[in-house]
Amino acid sequence: MLAEGWWSGGATYAGENWNFFGDRQSLLAQLVVTYEDGQQQTVVTSPDTWKYFNQGPVVYGSFFQGEVYDARKEQAIAGWSCPGYEDAAWKPAVEVTLENHVSQVGGGNVPKVNDYSAFHLKAQYGQTVRAIQQLTARSVEEVRPGIFVYDMGQNMVGVPEITLHGMEAGREINLRYAEGKYPDLPRYAGNEGMIMLENIRAAMAQDKYITKGGEETIAPRFTIMAIGMSRLRALTRPCPWKV
């Protein structure tokens, strides 16, 4: 599955830097397959041999804006990574050129990339992103009808994991994240108990999940959040929440 990553889309929480390298999700890959007998095969991305499918469950994914996931579409890609998968609905891949892409760079110290002639591609050399600790919400409060605020007990960077039971298909679950709640001050009258969003600037920090029905788990994979408090909307009861 493919999302914006650092390639395209919003690159900061300020909302002024977009599409540093390209304006469409793109994949450039070289896969080296090593067989049991030691022989190797190199597979590279090419419109001649690759296909794509853009009607999967991940509708949108962004580091700072969040993820939109429609679980009803999971069946459309069931088994896609297994031999024998029927890909008749998939389309031939197309080449995405780097020239003349539309970008917006507002930060004074951020260079606008429009010349790739001096670029040298290197494989990732840092550690892969992985979970190092799992936290469970310390408390949950229904601050408005159908709106639950979860207190994680500390600020951290992570992704949520919420288990849903007995859901009907097509229910939209809305999740928002913040570092704290509104203080009990006159200027914030009317927002008592709600999570405070002003300090995350232009970042939406929001996930939307559309249920497929039955038992399912919300676990975004193409976004990260600074979480201290989380708001879950469109449920009639609180659900188990981990980060």
Annotate each language-model stretch with its function.
Residues M1-V243:
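Extracellular/oxidizing-compartment recognition motifs
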